[in-house]
Amino acid sequence: MLAGRDAVTADPPSAATAPASWGRSTRRRYSIMLATAAIVIALDHLTKWLVTSHIPLGNQVPATNQIVNIHYIQNSGAAFGLFPQFTYFYVVVAVVVAGYILAFGPRMGGGLLRLVAFGCVLGGAISDGADRVLFGHVTDFIDFHFWPVFNVADIAIVGGMLVIVVQLGFGGGRPDRPPAERP
């Protein structure tokens, strides 16, 4: 109970009345998410730079096994190269996704894994979105022969979304509430 009010119907505290530790917790959650996004962006751009610097466009380099090749292509479409005429629509989608994650991601509840997942999606969206703005395409290079060619940002986006969807599917998606409002 909160000062004679039912905890279920009580309004959440404003920023002025929230405990100081709640603000630090939110900052910590944002820090984890943004650090993860920065790592994804750095890895994605490093790997793209290595590929574009050492492999001619369209060429393939077999890896040490028969499962994966490095195949340098430029993708102006969506996933799997679909709809290349909508390049700037994908930029808008990346901005909307990034904005949503920045606004609501750390407040969606869940633990460290979910924060890292949101950071992966954010980093992948920013990285591929930046490539579309700067170059008009995304560099893809990971080729498993049985699947369309993709990149590190794609792995981060798909992996992050998979974690988020699985966690939300198991009821872990309630927004964070201050300790006084928790059942």
List the predicted regions and their residue ranges.
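Alpha-helical transmembrane bundles and membrane-interface segments of multipass inner-membrane proteins
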Residues: 1-183
